[in-house]
């Protein structure tokens, strides 16, 4: 019999009711401080990997014990994941970093069938979990005790302003015919078994994003990875796997004219994607992350029903919040438009959750796609039968490669 070493949980909880603290996610009014310790079952003497395939933690939330089960999100990166940035003289620098032993997880709460979790374990635990219908955020505290974490509700992060935050959607692309009404396609409103589909996503961060994060490529990389991990979690309810296949950072200058006029920027991004990006990187959809303030309180813009179109399978998203969860909701929303989803009503709820396809973004207990969004997506599949999302982006063991100029090099090249 294999001897098993059990690392037990020891944690203390110190609620700071009514206190305020400045965290990476913003100024938080009400939070708990916890010291989570991992439960690990390994054969005696076994070498523990840096990031295990499965992990388990215990927390106390509102005084009640919570067991958090986490599983590495092996769908997060495609087999040919790459990263591109630019040298000061404009040369493309492209690498294929090894991401097999990454630190991004999805999971659930024990004894809560409706629970979900999307967590980064890169430096402590950071992300969110849904418990009894309520969304909680967790992130490390910068204290002398490195094990301290804050747990808080999204609603307890102070609002930066009260202005309405809206999404734009364009339906007047001449190259794409309008989507038929659901009633024309004889959809079954009770049908929940959607087919498995796969989206290989490219995220492009513009030069303002690069400057906003102090020209730190690693900070931008981590932020985008966490956002896509959240998006991947949202789309599991639709049986869609979203994998990041490329991250491009415009580190020297923007490759297109970025304007506050969101429609003009979207048009320019569409042209660049078709004439440049698609010629060097196979993918299904590209989203532009920009730090410019878009016009008319717009947080994002995307054409409707254009997934797999060589020009229009795109969206733009303003980097509007330090809360990665809200950024994930915004980008998932724009991606939803590409998949044929129209806006829900402004007060749409699915149970206690806010609908992801609401026209405006507000903080809520949790976020989900509505039944209407599922039906819009299903009718898009029936009408257009998009082919690019049929292939499964299987993971392989990539090898980190040195770089010279704008070319990918073989491992070990000098």
Curated annotation (Swiss-Prot):
Disulfide partners: 308-388, 348-355
Q: Does the keyword Thylakoid apply?
A: no
Name the cofactor(s) required for activity, per the record.
Answer: Zn(2+)
Q: What PROSITE patterns does its record include?
A: ADAM_MEPRO (PS50215), ZINC_PROTEASE (PS00142)
According to its UniProt entry, the protein's GO biological process terms are: collagen catabolic process; proteolysis
Subunit info?
Answer: Monomer.
Q: List the protein's name.
A: Snake venom metalloproteinase atrolysin-D
């Amino acid at each position: 019999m294999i001897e098993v070493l059990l690392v037990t949980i020891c944690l203390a909880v110190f609620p700071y009711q009514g206190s305020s603290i400045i965290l990476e996610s913003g100024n938080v009014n009400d939070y708990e401080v916890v010291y989570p310790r991992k439960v690990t079952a390994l054969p005696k003497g076994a070498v523990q990997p840096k990031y295990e395939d499965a992990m388990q933690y215990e927390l106390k939330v509102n005084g009640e014990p919570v067991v958090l089960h986490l599983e590495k999100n092996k769908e997060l990166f495609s087999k040919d994941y790459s990263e591109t940035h630019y040298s000061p003289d404009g040369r493309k620098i492209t690498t294929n970093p090894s991401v097999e032993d990454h630190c991004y997880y999805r999971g659930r709460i024990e004894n809560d069938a409706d629970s979900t979790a999307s967590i980064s374990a890169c430096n402590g635990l950071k992300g969110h979990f849904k418990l009894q219908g309520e969304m909680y955020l967790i992130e490390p505290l910068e204290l002398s005790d490195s094990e301290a974490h804050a747990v808080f509700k999204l609603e307890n992060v102070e609002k930066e302003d009260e202005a309405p935050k809206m999404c734009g959607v364009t339906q007047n692309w001449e190259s794409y015919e309008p989507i038929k009404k659901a009633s024309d396609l004889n959809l079954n409103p009770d049908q929940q078994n959607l087919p498995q589909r796969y989206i290989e996503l490219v995220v492009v961060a513009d030069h303002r994003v690069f400057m906003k994060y102090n020209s730190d490529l690693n900070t931008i990389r981590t932020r985008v990875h966490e956002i896509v991990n959240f998006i991947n979690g949202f789309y599991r309810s639709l049986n869609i796997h979203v994998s990041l296949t490329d991250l491009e950072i415009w580190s020297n200058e923007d490759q297109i004219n970025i304007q506050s006029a969101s429609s003009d920027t979207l048009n320019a991004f569409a042209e660049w994607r078709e004439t440049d990006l698609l010629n060097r990187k196979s993918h299904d959809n590209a989203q532009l992350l920009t730090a410019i303030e878009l016009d008319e309180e717009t947080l994002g813009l995307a054409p409707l029903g254009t997934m797999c179109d060589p020009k229009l399978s795109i969206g733009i998203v303003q980097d509007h919040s330090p809360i990665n969860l809200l950024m994930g909701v915004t980008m998932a929303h724009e991606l939803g438009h590409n998949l044929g989803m129209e806006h829900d009503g402004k007060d749409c709820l699915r149970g206690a959750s806010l609908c992801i396809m609401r026209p405006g973004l507000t903080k809520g207990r949790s976020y989900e796609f509505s039944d209407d969004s599922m039906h819009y997506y299903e009718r898009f599949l029936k009408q257009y039968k998009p082919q690019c999302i049929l292939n499964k982006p299987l993971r392989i063991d990539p090898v980190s490669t040195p770089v010279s100029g704008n070319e990918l090099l073989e491992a070990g090249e000098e």
